[in-house]
């Protein structure tokens, strides 16, 4: 049996070279100084794989349209087995990946590992950091709650303010002052279709460059015998990865991530709050108002990125021990103090978070029933076109988050079955346009539909049976 197994492995290795390459990878020479400070790269790759895996699991139950995204998130959090855990792993995994990538770059900068011939490796790392931050930016909108909506409005407004490119960026983002279906679709496409393969290819290129030039040594390594990656460094990397997973799993289980209320474009009093890793930029914008806003939102971040890319070409001094890189330490301390100070100021000056949605985590909310066909169960295949169009508009606006139809939906507003027997068409139309006038104290926003939309949605509502 053992001889047969050896023949199989020999056949595979002869055809694919997989065993030879694995051995070459594990037994590669690394500097004698290698140790704990070089585990961050492996942890970052692990967290990327976690993000890909949990993202795929979430996508199985996520509806990528504004009308259904919010309800599908409710469904994931309430009905899908381990849905809240997967959501927590994905959310906190994004934050941890940013932390680990930043720590990895700090370690590389502190040790001077970006110096010749490793300039391209450093630049690939900078681009990976930007891609990691872009994940958080594009994924922020996808829950389609108030926090997601208004946070993205700020992003699109910043993009619109970029000199010369503003109008083109707004068009690219599908936003001309508001955030709608086009913006949602493009953020989703970037988050799911573009960023993962781009990140995977860049990680592969980064690893190839590291293997080509080797792990950067420190002064004195040439006087000591080199080590093999396996077993000691592989063991340290494994311990670091396991520790990261324990921290991530604990956060996903303990830290509750409630949805806020359904995105409300009319809630102009809402104060958007970005994720913690963007709070420093959020605070910096407060110091640059009016014509100077573009300086804080575009110019300073752009200069910082440009400077990061140029570091290997600016610092051409000989490699020295970390203890002698005083200027590098001062730069890290200064950057950390600036980031920490701005973040702390943002936390102190930001009002409490928005009101969480009233979600019964013990009760089922099947978003698959919140489709035009199911919402209009009284409207079968012979239903008039206006009723079908109205059902689609009802879904698009997320009305089922507050109103129950055929026993499915929210309970914030009155159930809509039998509406035609309780209200006239004129009353419903006026309620859409001036809800506070018709029902003082209501939380329902105004919906100034055009004539066709108004006719369609009222027609649909009046086809819903008792």
Across the structure, where does each feature detected by a protein language model lie?
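Glycine-rich, acidic and aromatic/proline-enriched surface loops and short helix-turn segments
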Residues: 55, 164, 396, 434-437
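Electrostatic cytochrome c docking/interface patches
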Residues: 367-395
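Membrane-embedded alpha-helical bundles that constitute the cytochrome b-like, heme-associated redox core
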Residues: 1-283, 287, 296-326, 336-349
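Extracytoplasmic electron-transfer domains, predominantly the class I c-type cytochrome c fold
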Residues: 384, 401, 406, 410-466
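Terminal regions of secretory-pathway proteins
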Residues: 337-345, 361-374
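Alpha-helical transmembrane signal-anchor/signal-peptide segments
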Residues: 350-366
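Signature aromatic-anchored transmembrane alpha helix within multi-pass, membrane-resident enzymes
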Residues: 331-335
